[in-house]
UniProtKB/Swiss-Prot annotation:
This is Phosphoglycolate phosphatase. It catalyses: 2-phosphoglycolate + H2O = glycolate + phosphate. The active site is at D8. Its cofactor is Mg(2+). It comes from Halorubrum lacusprofundi (strain ATCC 49239 / DSM 5036 / JCM 8891 / ACAM 34).
Amino acid sequence: MVPPLALDIDGTLTTASGRLDARVFELLPDWDAPVVLATGKAFPYPVALAHFLGRAETVIAENGGVVHVDGETAILGDAEAPRAVVEAFRERGGDPGWGARDTVNRWRETEVALSLDADEALLREVAAAAGGDVEVVDTGYAYHVKSTGVSKGRGLERVGDALGIGPDEFVAIGDSENDVSTFAVAGESYAVANADGAAREAADIVVADSYMDGTAGVLADLRTRTE
């Protein structure tokens, strides 16, 4: 039997141009074990993807700030401190980088994401001045200002508890520093070749191929193992 999966989305299920790879719709709908979509994106994104895959809405959103499993949603992060940091960042001349119509954060409940064009040094300075309750995570796609201690890994532990599956039974695939906590609790972890240094160091295996090419290869190997 194939193992349950914990899958990042951006950089893992996508192409180099950021588009969702069509193979997602070939490989995941019939995966005969739970599939957890674990992302830094706002809650509606992984829910929508699960819906279009025809799978249960088992998701970890906002880097662990929101977890949805078995029809229950848990808010594990607190947006108050991250929003205060971003407001202070603005007051010091910083620009989050999304323009007036910020759909990146429109539905975000527990953190704030800023464009990679934002002033990272200033953002980290402001976040550090706020104390230890807030941290900045660079996913390679955005800077996420989030509650310290909230992580995808803790989200996966919560999902596992709800499903009666130990986190060490999951196979995790990802590409970024926000996947390190998932790799730490999963039984087996893979970084795709485009992964950043933190993810590569934390993963059990760094595969040769990038983006969905790498993920598809891992899934094929997992299927072969169970035949």
